[in-house]
Curated annotation (Swiss-Prot):
Record protein name field: Cytochrome b
GO molecular function (one): ubiquinol-cytochrome-c reductase activity
Family the UniProt entry places it in: Belongs to the cytochrome b family.
Species of provenance: Atractosteus spatula (Alligator gar)
InterPro entries: Cyt_b/b6_C, Cyt_b/b6_C_sf, Cyt_b/b6_N, Cytb/b6-like_sf, Cytochrome_b, Cytochrome_b_C_euk/bac, Cytochrome_b_N_euk/bac, Di-haem_cyt_TM
Source domain of life: Eukaryota
Annotated binding of heme b b566, by residue: 97, 196
Membrane topology classification: Multi-pass membrane protein
Keywords: Electron transport, Heme, Iron, Membrane, Metal-binding, Mitochondrion, Mitochondrion inner membrane, Respiratory chain, Transmembrane, Transmembrane helix, Transport, Ubiquinone
Length: 380
């Protein structure tokens, strides 16, 4: 009699996805981040669900309800700290996951990659509306500044902003709808994640060499299930340490002050994981130009597969392309730093140079280097 996991209609899908899945034997720890993102998503949904049971989406009560969760609800402080810092870890894992894809040429699985870019946009949207919910100063002013950017679109801009606000300013209607979106989007993310996996399992995983690995595959379980378990342990250990020992390290002190429309904070800035995009937005003096640059800083990932010029898939055997990849990483760190600095000399010019370099790397330098490497191979 055949094993039930191979015959049962539901179990055989699970079996094909996480048990008997043929996996390249040489994938490294960089392939752990997909499952870590799954862990982050589950953690965020569970902590978020329990927080939503005690949260009140009303401007007179939102700030107090968060204080109530932290003071009066059993382990409410822990739920909140894990949820807030879990978002940071979510983005760390996403950025490392994307970096892995860029380095090893995983983006050539176009369907998987495009769903991944969509997932990134959904997660960013979810994090943005979630940051507004505690209704502190930075929540309120962050919502005001970022939604106001839509007014840069010609003709429809002002109407669009008022439509999103539900009035003439960020108010109760805005908070209520942001809570609705923050509750709904993670379930859409879960659906998109299943599509992401569906497309991935059509082709199988890439590997560090970028070569076809059909000749050397092993079952996902037990080899990579245990390897993933180690990643889970490390992630949860670091997340727990941060949530328990220094939960406000990555937050903004301004958000401990209840929202006040009459007092503007000295420096309005988003959470650290949006700072690179915020720096690109601020480095362009024109409002519409800034908004377009902000959008393109993420959407540029969609054109990466089209601009792949090299005969080799992975960067493993391409030192010039490796150099450009690490310049891109350093550039992202510079942009993140600039995004948190005030708009004054020398930060303005540094931000502008870093922004130009960011787009140049994707659109010109990396494709050109791939082409040059092909030429060098031909000469050799």
């Amino acid at each position: 009699m055949a094993n039930i996991r191979k015959t049962h209609p539901l179990l055989k899908i699970i079996n094909g996805a996480v048990i008997d899945l043929p996996t390249p034997s040489n994938i490294s720890a960089w392939w752990n981040f997909g499952s870590l993102l799954g862990l982050c998503l589950i953690t965020q949904v569970l902590t978020g669900l329990f927080l939503a049971m005690h949260y009140t989406a009303d401007i007179t009560l939102a700030f107090s309800s968060v204080a109530h969760i932290c003071r009066d609800v059993n382990y409410g402080w822990l739920l909140r700290n894990i949820h807030a810092n879990g978002a940071s870890f979510f983005f760390i894992c996403i950025y490392l996951h994307i970096a892995r894809g860029l380095y090893y040429g995983s983006y050539l699985y176009k369907e998987t990659w495009n769903i991944g870019v969509l997932l990134l946009l959904l997660v960013m949207m979810t994090a943005f509306v979630g940051y507004v919910l505690p209704w502190g100063q930075m929540s309120f002013w962050g919502a005001t500044v970022i939604t106001n950017l839509l007014s840069a679109f010609p003709y429809i801009g002002d109407t669009l902003v008022q439509w999103i606000w539900g009035g003439f300013s960020v108010d109760n209607a805005t908070l209520t709808r942001f809570f609705t979106f923050h509750f709904l989007l993670p379930f859409i993310i879960m659906g998109a994640t299943m599509l992401h996996l569906l497309f991935l399992h059509e082709t199988g995983s890439n590997n560090p060499t970028g070569l076809n690995s059909d000749a050397d595959k092993v079952t996902f379980h037990p080899y990579f299930s245990y390897k993933d378990l180690l990643g889970f342990t490390i992630l949860l250990a670091i997340l727990s340490a941060l949530a328990l020992l220094n939960p406000n390290l990555l937050g903004d002190p301004e958000n401990f002050t209840p929202a006040n429309p009459l007092v503007t904070p000295p420096h309005i800035k988003p959470e650290w994981y949006f700072l690179f995009a915020y720096a690109i937005l601020r480095s362009i003096p024109n409002k519409l130009g800034g908004v377009l640059a902000l959008l393109l800083s993420i959407l540029i990932l969609v054109v990466v597969p089209v601009l792949h010029t090299s005969k080799q898939r992975s960067n493993t055997f391409r030192p010039p392309s490796q150099t450009l990849f690490w310049i891109l990483v350093a550039n992202m760190l510079v942009l993140t730093w600039i995004g948190g600095q005030p708009v004054e000399h020398p930060f303005i010019i540094i931000g502008q140079i870093a922004s130009v370099l960011y787009f140049m790397l994707f659109l010109i330098l990396i494709p050109l280097t791939g082409w040059l490497e092909n030429k060098i191979l031909d000469w050799a």
